[in-house]
Design a protein with these regions (language model features):
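Amphipathic alpha-helical "lid/sensor" segments that cap RecA-like P-loop NTPase cores
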Residues: 1-35
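Short hinge/gating elements
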Residues: 33-36, 62-64, 99-100, 134-148
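Short helix-coil-helix linker/hinge
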Residues: 39-47, 58-59
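Hydrophobic residues on short alpha-helical segments
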Residues: 46-54, 157
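Short acidic, hydrophobic short linear motifs in intrinsically disordered regions
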Residues: 56-68
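A short, conserved structural fragment
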Residues: 85-97
């Protein structure tokens, strides 16, 4: 609700994003730091996990997260991943074609603001454009279009129940999730 209230104060969504996300004093410029301070204090491991997952938008397994961060894949990491999942920042995904107890599990960053901040706002802080034109320039970039497509995919997965109701198949059993397969002797790795 807070984000929607902030957007409603502007004449258009475009103006809101430009002002809130790309002006130096914009609310979304500092919201990332506020979120982590309020949820996790000054524990840097949580930011490191989020940054790693933001750089890997299709998710990572626990073993890959541990290897990339140079930490053990044991209890502490599991607890930190659980904390981030409980806070709504990430979600453990099982491929839709696997049983619920599958060991093939990936953690994916699902918080819409954090995904936008890490992929778009933080990335745009490194570029120089005229004030008030950053979002316009960004909207035509391939990286933005790629982010937009993934965001639509995440939105659909998060709201699959409403989508199934609207499309009229809510009474039919179905599974939701990404399709990914590990590379093996018979098949290359793939992510859909």
């Amino acid at each position: 609700p807070k984000y929607l209230e902030l957007v409603a104060e502007h004449p258009s969504v475009y103006d809101a994003i430009e002002g809130l996300a790309f002006s130096p004093s914009g609310f979304f410029q500092t919201e990332y730091d506020r979120l982590f301070a309020s949820h996790f204090g000054k524990k840097p491991i949580y930011r490191r996990i989020i940054r790693l997952l933001s750089d890997n938008p299709y998710g990572l397994t626990v073993s890959r997260i541990a290897a990339e961060l140079g930490i053990a894949a044991g209890g502490s990491l599991s607890r930190q991943l659980d904390d981030l999942e409980s806070a709504g920042f990430l979600h453990a995904m099982i491929p839709f074609d696997k049983p619920d107890n599958s060991k093939l599990l990936k953690y994916v960053l699902i918080d819409a603001y954090v995904r936008f901040y890490t992929a778009i706002i933080r990335g745009e802080q490194r570029t120089q454009t005229m004030p008030g034109t950053q979002f316009r320039a960004l909207m035509s970039s391939p990286s933005y279009r790629s982010w937009l497509g993934r965001s639509f995919e995440y939105l659909c997965m998060q709201h699959h129940r409403e989508i199934s109701r609207i499309l009229g198949f809510e009474g039919i059993p179905y599974r939701v999730g990404p399709f990914f397969q590990r590379k093996n002797l018979n098949a290359p790795g793939v992510q859909i």
